[in-house]
Regions:
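Bacterial N-terminal signal peptides that target proteins for export
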Residues: 1-8
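Bacterial N-terminal signal peptides
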Residues: 8-19
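Boundary/entry segment of secreted carbohydrate-active catalytic domains
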Residues: 22-52
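Aromatic-rich peripheral "rim/lid" segments of glycoside hydrolase catalytic domains that contact
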Residues: 41, 255-257, 269-274, 281-322
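Alpha-helical scaffolding within the catalytic cores
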Residues: 44-49, 132-137, 183-193, 222-227, ...
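Substrate-binding cleft and catalytic face of glycoside hydrolase catalytic domains
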Residues: 56-74, 87-158, 250, 293-298
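Glycoside hydrolase catalytic-domain groove-lining segments
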Residues: 84-85, 105, 179-180, 188-257, ...
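Aromatic-lined carbohydrate-recognition surfaces of secreted/lumenal glycan-active proteins
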Residues: 105-108, 148-154, 158-160, 168-189, ...
Length: 322
């Protein structure tokens, strides 16, 4: 009997090690890292902040690089001054030194607007300029061994554009890692028709939620099931590339609202409870990983008196733990 048990145990061990019998990998946790005005990517402060992020147990850093344009109708996006190749090279290298797996994540920045409003007057001209701004970042991601590259984030008015295949093909000529697009929430992720071009389904996740924990759990499970179904339908892993909640009272009614849009009393307990609940639910539905929004290069950002999204120095920082 003892010999039989040992034999079964050995077979199980071999099975788990074999490619055809994989145990479910643990869901990774990470954060979107934004540069602070007082802590540029090349600074010692930014290095300290990335070290602190790694110290939470986070595995990945999604380094936000901004492509700038003057207004939503502009046709000429360009790489932002705070996201120069030299700056982003420093960000990637410091992430590696800190023990984090870096992703370069491209966002469009429009003063007074957000990326979902990008609606160029000449779509073909916009994509040509965007590709010109993006390709040096793709080469940088290749040179500095970024794990992944996000080539677009929440471009809801452009997600059906016919230029995506050409853009992705151009990027793949210089970058061999994982390529992602991050859709603006589940509805846009479900209708995006180009997932076959990418290595994972990427989405942000800021749905309205109920105050009552029970109702909130039902809403979260429904959202997570939709993401799981989408991943299975297109045959790709799912990255929740942005998940956030302000540490502010009343933030469940509109989780996407910034402090500039609404002033509210600090509530770090709510942020912790909701992000913990999201982590549990998404893991149960097979999501590959979650990147919280957000983390700043200023190591003093956040703290118990802060009502912004960052989890730095707040109880919700523990959501990143392994």
């Amino acid at each position: 009997m003892c010999k039989r048990v040992l034999t079964l145990a050995a077979l199980l061990a071999v099975c788990l090690l074999a490619n055809g019998c994989n145990a479910a990998a643990p869901m990774w946790m990470g954060a979107n890292v934004k540069v602070s005005a007082n802590a540029p990517w090349e600074s010692a402060a930014a290095a300290q902040s990335l070290d602190a992020l790694a110290g939470t147990g986070a595995r990945k850093a999604l380094l936000v690089a901004f492509v700038w344009q003057a207004n939503p109708q502009s046709n000429d996006p360009v790489l932002g001054s705070d996201s120069s190749l030299e700056a982003m090279r420093a960000a990637l290298r410091q992430s590696h030194r800190s023990g984090l797996q870096p992703t370069l994540k491209v966002h469009v920045w429009i003063p007074g607007h957000w990326a979902g409003e990008v609606a160029p007057a000449d779509q073909a001209a916009w994509f040509a300029a965007y590709q010109k701004a993006l390709l040096p970042l793709a080469q940088l991601a290749e040179d500095e061994h970024a794990e992944a590259l996000v080539v677009g984030t929440e471009l809801r008015k452009l997600q059906d554009a016919p230029q995506w295949p050409e853009l992705v093909a151009a990027v793949r000529k210089v970058y061999r890692g994982k390529l992602l697009y991050v859709a603006d929430g589940m509805e846009h992720a479900e209708t995006f028709r180009y997932w076959s071009l990418f290595d994972a389904v990427g989405t942000s996740l800021y749905p309205r939620l109920s105050d009552a924990a029970g109702a909130r759990a039902t809403e979260m499970n429904a959202a997570a099931q939709r993401l799981q179904d989408l991943g299975q339908r297109v045959g790709k892993p799912v990255w929740v590339a942005e998940l956030g909640l302000r540490s502010a009272r009343g933030s469940l009614a509109a989780p996407w609202e910034s402090p500039e849009q609404r002033t509210a009393a600090v509530d770090t307990r709510l942020q912790l409870q909701v992000l913990q609940q999201w982590r549990k639910v998404l893991q149960a539905h097979g999501v590959d990983g979650i990147a919280l929004w957000c983390w700043y290069t200023d190591p003093a950002a956040g703290g118990p008196g802060d009502s912004d999204f960052t989890v730095q120095g707040k109880p919700a920082q523990q959501v990143l733990a392994r």
